[in-house]
Amino acid sequence: MKLPIYLDYSATTPVDPRVAQKMSECLLMDGNFGNPASRSHVFGWKAEEAVENARRQVAELVNADPREIVWTSGATESDNLAIKGVAHFYSGKGKHIITSKIEHKAVLDTCRQLEREGFEVTYLEPGEDGLITSALVEAALRDDTILVSVMHVNNEIGTVNDIAAIGELTRSRGVLFHVDAAQSTGKVEIDLDKLKVDLMSFSAHKTYGPKGIGALYVRRKPRVRIEGQMHGGGHERGMRSGTLATHQIVGMGEAFRIAKEEMAQENARVLALRDRFFAQIDGLEELYINGSMTSRVPHNLNVSFNYVEGESLIMALKDLAVSSGSACTSASLEPSYVLRALGRNDELAHSSIRFTFGRFTTEEEIDYAAKKVVEAVSKLRELSPLWDMYKEGVDLSQVEWQAH
């Protein structure tokens, strides 16, 4: 077993060796290095063939038409393209957008930008279980609503929203529905032939593919129109200009092909690992699971250890790569906005740790990690006067602290 142990698979995943091999074949002079847009010679034709094969592999994982897949630089760009693209194209129809308070920053900050441009955005509050329901969406719908954007799987707490029910609602009301699915490919079944979803964002690096490549699903029937945000050579049917990165696209295609083949057994294995880990830390007092345990992806466990500062726990767990909050916001010392939206107080939000397991996690690593967590939490609590007061039965919420 090698240290440190990586337990932050929701931040990023290592590239699968099979993916790296396919990518390496698209770089050198004797490989498939051509520009897919070069129509006048065999180097371009071969590259285009590889790109279209990858487009088909991405489409097959989510049961879409390959023509509905648009390449982007990642899920952040896909979110921007979907939300701004719809808002700008359909602004004559209405200027109201619905999203939730626990979306990824790529969605929230895009919506904030649209607010500066004169759009109105409603931010839904999840229940304590971290779920956004169709009833919540329905209550916020208005005559001038043009778009609903709700994530499939939450990046911090791993909860899975019922996008099928939300899709039925939005389609019946003639409102477009965008789903950020960066965290769900390879973990949750997605069937875009059945789901009434109009736009869906994908990322390669959350699914054992390379960073810097993603895709946006744009439905053809009923047809969804978006305004391109990147202008240039008119690539991707005008929706996203820029020379296609063959090696990254091929990597994403291969990663999604593997995800389709191995998802069922992979999920069962990772769920067993998570259950094994949780069983070993469950004996700790004042341990709170964040988000629903039933509507949740198998690889995520987000827990708060009361009376322990999350940052100090991460420092104590120097052999474990884990995070508090998401990777994109872990540099800030603010408590997780996702956990605050669930109704957690600042103390519990600050004491949360996200453990995420994946393809290369072993039982040996799980057992070692659980042992280290129990030791670190117990040690930090021994040092905490608040823990002593709690153990003595003092109600800390009633204590009036003196300011110095």
From Swiss-Prot:
Its cofactor is pyridoxal 5'-phosphate. [2Fe-2S] cluster binds at C328. Gene3D superfamilies: Aspartate Aminotransferase, domain 1, Type I PLP-dependent aspartate aminotransferase-like (Major domain). Keywords: 2Fe-2S, Cytoplasm, Iron, Iron-sulfur, Metal-binding, Pyridoxal phosphate, Transferase. Pyridoxal 5'-phosphate binds at A75, T76, N155, Q183, S203, A204, H205, T243. It is found in: Cytoplasm. The active site is at C328. Pathway: Cofactor biosynthesis; iron-sulfur cluster biosynthesis. GO terms for molecular function: 2 iron, 2 sulfur cluster binding; cysteine desulfurase activity; metal ion binding; pyridoxal phosphate binding. GO terms for cellular component: L-cysteine desulfurase complex. The modification N6-(pyridoxal phosphate)lysine is found at K206. PANTHER family: CYSTEINE DESULFURASE, CYSTEINE DESULFURYLASE FAMILY MEMBER. This is Cysteine desulfurase IscS. It comes from Pseudomonas aeruginosa (strain LESB58). The lineage of its organism: Bacteria, Pseudomonadati, Pseudomonadota, Gammaproteobacteria, Pseudomonadales. The gene is iscS.
